[in-house]
Design a protein with these regions (language model features):
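C-terminal capping alpha-helices of c-type cytochrome domains
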Residues: 58-117
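Sequence/structural segment immediately N-terminal to covalent heme-attachment motifs in c-type
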Residues: 1-19
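Extracytoplasmic electron-transfer domains, predominantly the class I c-type cytochrome c fold
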Residues: 17-19, 24-81
Length: 119
């Protein structure tokens, strides 16, 4: 699966993000998540290139490499998220930002409530 991870990062991560969670593309397009998708559908998508996805012919990515990518996706799918709230496995920056936004929102709410109570 290490080879599959490298192949995924080189061929797929720019659209589906490094964790296979999908994401926004240009011109309002979207790359779907690969988590929870049947392996045969992932393989078919690689050879047909649906929507704005490129076609990965056998000359570009061999069938063995395609299967290695799928194996890596399935292994990543079953890994526990040790970082807390998943948030698309974007990482600690997003999780920290969410904490700050919620915390500041609560502080503003308390300040408004105290100001209203003082009147």
């Amino acid at each position: 699966t290490a080879d599959g991870g490298e192949l995924f990062r080189n061929n797929c991560a720019m659209c589906h993000n490094f964790a296979g969670q999908g994401g926004a593309l240009t011109q309002g397009k979207y790359a779907p998540t690969l988590m929870g998708v049947e392996p045969k559908h992932i393989y078919e998508a690689m050879i047909t290139g649906p929507q704005s996805m490129p076609v990965f012919s056998d000359k570009v990515v061999t069938p063995e490499e395609k299967l290695s990518i799928i194996k890596w996706i399935k292994a990543a799918e079953s890994e526990p998220n040790l970082g807390g709230a998943a948030l698309g496995r974007v990482g600690p920056v997003t999780e920290g930002l969410l904490g700050w936004v919620l915390g500041l929102g609560m502080l503003i709410g308390v300040a408004v409530w105290l100001a209203m109570k003082a009147k």
